[in-house]
Amino acid sequence: MTLDNYNIFNDEYLFGMPLSPLPKVLGTFDGIQLAPTLTTPTLTPTTTRSLQEAFFELTNDPGTPYQATFKPPPLGLMPGGNNGNGVTNVPTTTATATVVGVVNPMISQLPYEVNSALQGTDSDNSNASWADAQNNEDQDTTDTSSAHTDSTSYQNGHMAGSSVNGGGANNFTNVLAGINAGRGSTQGSNTNTSNSATPARRGGGRRPNRNTNMSPEEEEKRRIRRERNKQAAARCRKRRVDQTNELTYEVEQLEKKRDGLKKEMETLTDVKNQLEFFLRAHHSSCQKIRTDLLSVTTCNGLIAPVGLPSAGSCDSGSSSHHNNNSNDSSNGTITGLDASLNSTGRSNSPLDLKPQIKDEPLDGGLDSSCLLDQDGPPPSKRFPLPPMSTLMTPTGVSSGSLQTPIASTAPGGFGSAYPITTTKGSMNSPTLNELNKPKERPNTLAVQRPFVPQMHLNLTSNHNKMPGSGPTHIQGVPIQTPTTGFNFDSLMDGGTGLTPVSGPLVPSQNKHPLELPTPTAEPSKLVSL
């Protein structure tokens, strides 16, 4: 087929016939041109079979050729129409030759009929070659080395009739005949090349090439290698299963150990709680703890060791003879200290805890029987009061009394509104005493001296009483309350300069309620600095 014939074929079959099924068929072939040349991609058994099936399906469509209710007559081979190239020219009828763009539906019969006219071929041999090629394709899935054989088949003159000058229909039948001829010659060349050398693999995957022409030694090697692989895989699976079982057993043992530890912790916690409960219940009635808390053995003001015997100057039993509430540093026991001081850790180096306690004279009016027990809390300390003459300003009156004088009448503010009957029977007679008279502003400050044994207060004496002081005896029994003879200034080492220096209020005799002294009855006497 020349270039002119190729152009004519393209114009007639590809572009001039829109209803023809051939453009669809020829357009789906990957890289296959109509007229094979030296640069044309070669045909393989797979593409040849797909081409044959496509032609068979498209030409056997019953609806396409008979749309115009016209059935062309069948074409037959003419006996004398050989052109010398081994290809018979098929004469066409008048209808098919004169009508442009109509394809004869019986053209599908031409490949099988043309093959019978080829030199040295037969239709039975062609069918057998197709079956053999198909079987060869099933056996060798990776054999794609038919390019050389196909190209040589075209060069050997199997398609010599392609250069015949003729009509478009006759040229197309020649092309189909050449395709079948190339398909028939492919089988013999493929068998020769497969026997000569194993083709290279062009596909991926683990599946090796079919061992159709493999030597027995190679087959034995492959079998041995396959058996070894199977054994290695089985050993690997067994080792993995063994490791899994071992780890599972170890996990079970650890879980059991954890459960045992949890139970042991719970048991120990219960025992601890029970012991703590017993300790709390016994703490209130434990005599040893009470003894350790209340007494610590001392020797010359030092805490003695635990095993030191009390002898000589370290007489711990002499504390029972001293009920004067004084802690002697040379003998006796120190009460109220913590029992932790009497520990073995401090026995080698006792602490020098020598308390400095002031000498406190006893109160003459207090009986020793009123003191609390030695085990109880210590009684409150009592201090003697100095004479009030050192604290009072010289106003010309007796100032040694601690009692506050009581006014015989109410203040002037009350006397103007309410008539008050005094003991003398006179109405609104202001009986002036020393507290109601105006007093001078003091210009000196009395400082209290330290406590001296001579500065004792005798509550039963009468030389420092004022005329209006209250009684200190009730039916011969002295009043011994904590507030008797005390005020705030007597508890300090001197006046603060801001507190009144008058004596404390003492309950008076049966007086009128309006005659009782009030905070506003007299001006406060402040000491100026």
Curated annotation (Swiss-Prot):
In-chain residues carrying the UniProt-annotated modification Phosphoserine: S349
Superkingdom, natural source: Eukaryota
Start-end of Polar residues biased regions: 118-134, 340-350
Any one annotated GO CC term: nucleus
InterPro entries linked to this entry: AP-1 (IPR000837), bZIP (IPR004827), bZIP_sf (IPR046347)
Location of this chain's protein in the cell: Nucleus
Region annotation Basic motif: where it falls in the sequence: 221-240
Stretches the record annotates as Disordered: 118-166, 180-239, 311-390, 493-529
The keyword S-adenosyl-L-methionine is annotated on this UniProt entry: no
Chief location: nucleus
UniProt xrefs under PROSITE patterns: BZIP (PS50217), BZIP_BASIC (PS00036)
Pfam families: bZIP_1
Compositional bias per record (Low complexity), positions renumbered to this chain: 142-153, 182-201, 315-332, 363-375
Domain bZIP: 219-282
Gene Ontology terms: biological process: embryo development ending in birth or egg hatching
Region feature Leucine-zipper, mapped onto this chain: 247-275
Molecular function GO terms recorded: DNA binding; DNA-binding transcription factor activity, RNA polymerase II-specific; RNA polymerase II cis-regulatory region sequence-specific DNA binding
PANTHER family, per the entry: ACTIVATING TRANSCRIPTION FACTOR 3-RELATED (PTHR23351:SF24), FOS TRANSCRIPTION FACTOR-RELATED (PTHR23351)
Subunit annotation: Homodimer. Heterodimer with Jra. The kay-Jra heterodimer binds more stably to the AP-1 site than either of the two proteins alone.
Protein name in UniProt: Transcription factor kayak
Organism for this UniProt entry: Drosophila ananassae (Fruit fly)
Gene: kay
